[in-house]
Amino acid sequence: MIIIGEKINGSIPSVADAIARRDADFIKQRAIAQTEAGATFIDCCASVPEAQEVETLRWMIDCIQSVTDLPISVDSPSTKVLSEAYKFCNKPGLFNSVSGEGHKMDAIFPIMAENPGWQVIALLSDDTGIPKNAADRLDRKSVV
């Protein structure tokens, strides 16, 4: 089973506060706790404006990697951000979450092909939305 530690996410108020204050100890403690709890990946999501996101993720990834060897799950809705932030990781990790909207998969899949070991959580939503039933989900999975 793959377990993704999702507790370093700027959508969580205490994490957003730590990010705003650049509280490295808070981020590191969250990474240690998730490592000790058996996570397979440590998710890293800044949830800040896109103009600040790459540099914020760099800082967060550096904090995490200073206390654990677990791979990073780089988490952003922006493929532009993902295509930069993965470079800060010491080892292959996970792109979390890439949807079928627009050209998002077209942007990330070539990066994965050029960087063996990277994985992806691919969402079945596309420009028409989230599939409403199992048949539609099965139809869309062929795109991935």
Question: Language-model segments: which ranges?
Answer:
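Short, well-ordered coil/turn segments that N-cap beta-strands
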Residues: 1, 38-40, 68-71, 90-93, ...
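Active-site mouth loops of central-metabolism enzymes
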Residues: 3-29, 94-100, 127-138
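Gly-rich Lys/Arg/Thr-decorated short loops/hinges at beta-loop-alpha junctions or inter-strand turns
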Residues: 9-16, 36-45, 121-128
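Acidic (Asp/Glu)-rich catalytic clusters
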Residues: 35-36, 84-89, 107-117
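Glycine-rich, proline-tolerant flexible connector loops at the mouths of alpha/beta enzymes
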Residues: 35-70
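Catalytic beta/alpha-barrel core
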Residues: 43-49, 70-78, 93-103
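Short, charged, surface-exposed secondary-structure boundary motifs
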Residues: 102-110, 130-131
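Conserved small/polar residues in nucleotide/adenosyl-binding loops
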Residues: 143-144
